[in-house]
UniProtKB/Swiss-Prot annotation:
Belongs to the bacterial ribosomal protein bL31 family. Type B subfamily. NCBIfam families: L31, PRK01678.1. Part of the 50S ribosomal subunit. This is Large ribosomal subunit protein bL31B. It comes from the Bacteria. One of its GO terms (biological process) is translation. Keywords: Ribonucleoprotein, Ribosomal protein. GO terms for molecular function: structural constituent of ribosome. InterPro entries: Ribosomal_bL28/bL31-like_sf (IPR034704), Ribosomal_bL31 (IPR002150), Ribosomal_bL31_B (IPR027493), Ribosomal_bL31_sf (IPR042105). The gene is rpmE2. The lineage of its organism: Bacteria, Pseudomonadati, Pseudomonadota, Betaproteobacteria, Burkholderiales. Pfam families: Ribosomal_L31 (PF01197). GO terms for cellular component: ribonucleoprotein complex; ribosome.
Length: 115
């Protein structure tokens, strides 16, 4: 291996912020925060939203995990616009054009009388 091109592989503590579960492992992740671990040493700290202690697959529980508000962001961005386009001005204008065309066609053709 070439020296100086690889990231530092060191011990780091991960903390699940949803339930304060923490574990120490090795990683190349860089972080500015540190934490004092059970053995008295200080290690870099990485905060995560989900771990095996809080993920529904491993816990067997159902819970909504929309901590970042992704659904609301999506609805704000696309929800109201998509509904407005589908049932709004475009559909109304098309219906008006079709009705006007049908009326014009009916006015052009003279009514036939039965003799």
């Amino acid at each position: 291996m070439k020296p100086g091109i690889h990231p530092e592989y060191r011990e780091i503590v991960f903390v699940d912020v949803s339930n304060n579960f923490s574990f120490k492992t090795r990683s190349t992740m860089s972080t500015r925060e540190t934490i004092k671990w059970e053995d008295g040493n200080e290690y870099p700290l990485a905060k995560i939203e989900t771990s095996s202690e809080s993920h529904p697959f491993y816990t067997g529980t159902q819970k909504i995990m929309d901590t970042a508000g992704r659904v609301e962001k999506f609805r704000q961005k696309f929800g109201t616009k998509a509904v407005a386009k589908a049932s709004g001005d475009g559909a109304a204008k098309t219906a008006e054009k079709k009705a006007a065309a049908a009326e014009a066609k009916a006015a052009e053709k003279p009514a036939k009388k039965k003799a």
